[in-house]
Amino acid sequence: MNTKQEVEKFLEDIKVRISTGVSNLLFLNGREKNAQALLDLDITPNMRVEIILSLKAEDFYRTEDGKYRDQYEMHSFGKLVKNNEVYIKISKTENGIICISFHISEFPIKYSFK
């Protein structure tokens, strides 16, 4: 995704798919820092979903160089949650939406459209 319009379209698509139940939103909680983020931020899993549903094009960081499972693009965002910048990486597959990363950012995020 290179343009703000492409990011807006991606976000609209995943939001519709999640909110209508067409696609499940799967979190990779097996990754320690993703699970730890819920504790560090003092948020519930449902709050995490709401944060993803609130993403805007202005929160877009970049499209990652690699691919999830060698075939699906990964898109990264940042969001301020309880005064912490949270790094969020999402991939859209034909079967669902995968949140690969959701944790406090380890580096400053340079937003593409802010």
What are the residue ranges of the model-derived segments?
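Functional cores of ribonucleases/endoribonucleases
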Residues: L53-G96
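Charged, low-complexity, helix/coiled-coil-prone segments
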Residues: R31-K33, N84, I109
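Compact soluble domain cores
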Residues: N2-Q5, K9-Q71
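Enriched for short, Lys/Arg-rich terminal
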Residues: S91-K114
